[in-house]
Amino acid sequence: MMAKPNGKIQFKNLQSHGVLADPDFPKRTWKLLKTAMRQIHQQNASNLSFEELYRNGYNMVLQKHGDLLYNNLKKMVDKHLKAVAKTVSESIDEKFLLELNSSWINHKTSMLMIRDILMYMDRNYVKQNNLSSVFDLGLYLFRDNVAHCSTIKDRLLNTLLSMVQKEREGEVIDRILIKNIVQMLIDLGVNSKNVYIEDFEKPLLLKTSSHYQAQSQTLIQTCSCPDYMKKVEICLKEELERVSHYLDSSSEPKLKEVCEKQLISNHMRTLIDMENSGLISMLKDDKIEDLKRMYNLFSRVSDGLNLMKDVISSYVKEIGRGIVMDEEKTKESGTYFQSLLDLKDKYDNLLQNALYNDKQFIHSIQQAFEYFINLNPKSPEYISLFIDEKLKKGLKGVSEEEVDIILDKILMLFRLIQEKDVFEKYYKQHLAKRLLLGRSISDDAERNMIAKLKTECGYQFTSKLEGMFTDMRLSQDTMSGFKTYIQNLKKALPIDLNVHVLTTGFWPTQNTANCNLPREILLCCEAFKSYYLSNHNGRLLLWQTNMGTAEIKANFPSKSHELQVSSYQMVILLLFNDQSKLTFKEIADQTGIPTIDLKRNLLALTNPKNKILDRELPSTTSSTTTTTTTATSSSTSTSPSSSSSSISTPTPSKSIDESDVFAFNTKFKSKLFRVKVMAVVQKETPVEEKETRDKVDEDRKHQIEASIVRIMKARKTLEHSNLVSEVIKQLQSRFVPNPVIVKKRIESLIEREYLERSKQDRKIYNYMA
């Protein structure tokens, strides 16, 4: 409803005078009022006495002539507005709206004056008879006689729509004039906006829809996706400006809906699928601004973000699947996992800078990563290997803050691994090597990683890892006591022995065949065993020669070197103090080293980088020379030895064959005095993979059974499907149990009388205390 002027004519000390019954009073008084109202309509009211006019109107109502006054007013204004409508209709071109606006302003002003004159009638007669007020009556009459005049109504609509269209096409229009006309339509609805809605808003929305339908079809065929979106942004901005300048605010959501439907909703799929510029192209080329623009536009319409989210998720799955199934990338665990980290960084950046960290996109992309990272059964091993590489040398020279960031990134992908128990197996193996070989770049970094795993998976997950650190600390104390013990005996050992005492349950120990250690080594081992068992009665020591290292002195013709080798390599090299050359079988028989481990260590010793041994075919002949090797220390056991040995010339080979013959490399040279010769790191053999998997499966059986018992102990009675669901829910932080395996473990527990089937329903289990 229009805002009515605050100014009113004030009548002070007005008194009612007795009026004698006069049959001509109504007619005479109306004539006087009518003349005054005509002058008001003609904008010639300066000489009128409004106090006298008010008194006449007051007396008319007082003398019960309110109906006459009201009806005559209606007729007079009606007649006047018909003349106004004729004048407006006759105006041409651009003068049409100006004339209409002028007539409207004059009419409002006139009706305000007339309202003040007939104020008493408004407050009494009109209110008592539930009629429209004087001013509202004027609005209704203007609506019916002018705005809805047959020669004005359609012309008014067409003129307004034409002006809006011209502005859309870039022309400058009189926004203030349109605003006044729009306000007129709003005012003519009195207490509603029906006139504005029916006469202008609805046709405007239809016109807007057809305009942008045509424009969008043209743009979608001629523009790239980014260019189209930029033009859409401009269109939407201009439409909002239109609302603020001359439309009613209630039109904004309706206008937005129409524009967004034609410009966005109807073309979402086309925009996404545009070749070389659509959503996939933006993702490939990291078009952050374009992706952000698409998010902003698609967020305006129903299902826009869902469509965008699904396409991104499918694309991420496709790219991730390509990485985890790429044979070249999976050959190197570092390359494999770094590719996944790079992909994660890329989409974390996209989420933050283009998608406003929208939770539904975060969840969708995370699900995509979880999908493809678990396609490769080796992912748990590769994550552990990647961490192993970082904690050995990849974090060297990096600040604590940067280390924390890198470990957190790794942990983000670790969370997505379903087989966390498999990861734990490999992590224990790799951590054991780092600790025993002293390869960790930082004890703090190791503990930081374990703390993060503990936060992520709980104490049970890391308790054995923490136990490994405890063993390392206690071993230092044990060795300190052992050295004091030897000193007190006043009998020096032939080598500097360092032993790590490992708790079987914590470390990934193996039931390997005992290696045939030299006599001097065995002497040292027995001395340590005697000391240890005297302090820890009832314990059993099993030597893990495969996990040890040694430092031995090797005398080559050119110079002497200190070799850092594994315990197996030490045992192999010491054989050449007594023999000139040895076949693979002879080395195997004399050392007792398992074939797989023997091949790995011989491959390391014949590696061109640090070629300590030569290989030759059985028929090859060679000259000989003499060298001496002396063992100086070992993590588990070592033995000194000194004697001559004949060695053969080298024969290149990339793999160890059981027919190979080995000899000491007299031509070995190195700029370094201390030469590190460690076993060649190879991927697990199929047999080793099966052993690891069997261990994991066996552990899972126990964990599933423990979970079943815990649940049934608490619930007492439970239906099969509910029990399986609860077991999966309880264990999914470590691995996702196969329902078939869960069923087998339930049956095993029934056989062992932990559970029983209900007699009423065999699908229901009861806990047996």
From Swiss-Prot:
<dbReference type="InterPro" id="IPR016159">
    <property type="entry name" value="Cullin_repeat-like_dom_sf"/>
</dbReference>
<dbReference type="InterPro" id="IPR036390">
    <property type="entry name" value="WH_DNA-bd_sf"/>
</dbReference>
<dbReference type="Pfam" id="PF10557">
    <property type="entry name" value="Cullin_Nedd8"/>
</dbReference>
<feature type="domain" description="Cullin neddylation">
    <location>
        <begin position="699"/>
        <end position="761"/>
    </location>
</feature>
<keyword id="KW-1017">Isopeptide bond</keyword>
<dbReference type="InterPro" id="IPR036317">
    <property type="entry name" value="Cullin_homology_sf"/>
</dbReference>
<dbReference type="GO" id="GO:0031625">
    <property type="term" value="F:ubiquitin protein ligase binding"/>
</dbReference>
<dbReference type="InterPro" id="IPR016157">
    <property type="entry name" value="Cullin_CS"/>
</dbReference>
<dbReference type="Pfam" id="PF00888">
    <property type="entry name" value="Cullin"/>
</dbReference>
<dbReference type="InterPro" id="IPR045093">
    <property type="entry name" value="Cullin"/>
</dbReference>
<dbReference type="GO" id="GO:0016567">
    <property type="term" value="P:protein ubiquitination"/>
</dbReference>
<dbReference type="InterPro" id="IPR001373">
    <property type="entry name" value="Cullin_N"/>
</dbReference>
<protein>
    <recommendedName>
        <fullName>Cullin-3</fullName>
    </recommendedName>
</protein>
<comment type="pathway">
    <text>Protein modification; protein ubiquitination.</text>
</comment>
<feature type="compositionally biased region" description="Low complexity">
    <location>
        <begin position="618"/>
        <end position="653"/>
    </location>
</feature>
<feature type="cross-link" description="Glycyl lysine isopeptide (Lys-Gly) (interchain with G-Cter in NEDD8)">
    <location>
        <position position="713"/>
    </location>
</feature>
<comment type="function">
    <text>Probable core component of cullin-based SCF-like E3 ubiquitin-protein ligase complexes which mediate the ubiquitination and subsequent proteasomal degradation of target proteins. The E3 ubiquitin-protein ligase activity of the complex is dependent on the neddylation of the cullin subunit.</text>
</comment>
<dbReference type="GO" id="GO:0006511">
    <property type="term" value="P:ubiquitin-dependent protein catabolic process"/>
</dbReference>
<keyword id="KW-0832">Ubl conjugation</keyword>
<keyword id="KW-0833">Ubl conjugation pathway</keyword>
<feature type="region of interest" description="Disordered">
    <location>
        <begin position="614"/>
        <end position="655"/>
    </location>
</feature>
<dbReference type="InterPro" id="IPR019559">
    <property type="entry name" value="Cullin_neddylation_domain"/>
</dbReference>
<dbReference type="InterPro" id="IPR016158">
    <property type="entry name" value="Cullin_homology"/>
</dbReference>
<dbReference type="InterPro" id="IPR036388">
    <property type="entry name" value="WH-like_DNA-bd_sf"/>
</dbReference>
<dbReference type="GO" id="GO:0031463">
    <property type="term" value="C:Cul3-RING ubiquitin ligase complex"/>
</dbReference>
<comment type="similarity">
    <text>Belongs to the cullin family.</text>
</comment>
<dbReference type="GO" id="GO:0005634">
    <property type="term" value="C:nucleus"/>
</dbReference>
<keyword id="KW-0539">Nucleus</keyword>
